[in-house]
């Protein structure tokens, strides 16, 4: 019995350390997948790249990172549900951003940009985040 009481703190510590490692690793994998998808999308010469989208990056400075990811995900969802172009790539990007945001939100910004500019800005943000991960 004495050995069991000594092992409990060690096991708890190992579980905590493992969960932190896995969480950080998941962050890397998700970001890599997002950046890869954004590289593919921004390299395409497609008429859909000129579609007008809500510029969620023009939101107030006090907007959290999760809110920005959530809004970007909402914009992407609107695009691939109403247009047939690049549907699988945009839906995958939406899914990954949604998992990082882990919340629901609405988009109310009036400022617009093109899909290409939106994706380029998102790629820059994700590369910055990846460099810190």
Swiss-Prot record:
Pfam families membership: IL4 (PF00727)
Family label: Belongs to the IL-4/IL-13 family.
Segment forming the signal sequence: 1-24
Keyword check for Cytoplasm: no
Record-linked Gene3D superfamilies: 1.20.1250.10
Sugar-modified residues: 62
This protein's UniProt keywords: B-cell activation, Cytokine, Disulfide bond, Glycoprotein, Growth factor, Secreted, Signal
Gene source species: Sus scrofa (Pig)
The protein's role, per its UniProt record: Participates in at least several B-cell activation processes as well as of other cell types. It is a costimulator of DNA-synthesis. It induces the expression of class II MHC molecules on resting B-cells. It enhances both secretion and cell surface expression of IgE and IgG1. It also regulates the expression of the low affinity Fc receptor for IgE (CD23) on both lymphocytes and monocytes. Positively regulates IL31RA expression in macrophages. Stimulates autophagy in dendritic cells by interfering with mTORC1 signaling and through the induction of RUFY4.
Main location: secreted
Database matches in PROSITE patterns: INTERLEUKIN_4_13
Xref: InterPro entries: 4_helix_cytokine-like_core (IPR009079), IL-4 (IPR002354), IL-4/IL-13 (IPR001325), IL-4/IL-13_CS (IPR018096)
Name of protein: Interleukin-4
MF (Gene Ontology): cytokine activity; growth factor activity; interleukin-4 receptor binding
A biological process term (GO) from this entry: T cell activation
Name of the encoding gene: IL4
S-S bonds: 27-133, 48-85, 70-105
A GO-annotated cellular component: extracellular space
Subcellular location: Secreted
């Amino acid at each position: 019995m004495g050995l069991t009481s000594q092992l409990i703190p060690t096991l708890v510590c190992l579980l905590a350390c493992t969960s932190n490692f896995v969480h950080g690793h998941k962050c890397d994998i998700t970001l890599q997948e997002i950046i890869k998808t954004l590289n593919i999308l921004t390299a395409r010469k497609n008429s859909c790249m000129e579609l007008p989208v809500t510029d969620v990056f023009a939101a107030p400075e006090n907007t959290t990172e999760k809110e920005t990811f959530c809004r970007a995900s909402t914009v992407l969802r609107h695009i691939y549900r109403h247009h047939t172009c690049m549907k699988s790539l945009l839906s995958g990007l939406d899914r990954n951003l949604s998992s990082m945001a882990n919340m629901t939100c609405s988009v109310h910004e009036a400022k617009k940009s093109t899909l290409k500019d939106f994706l380029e800005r998102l790629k820059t943000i994700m590369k910055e985040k990846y460099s810190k991960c």
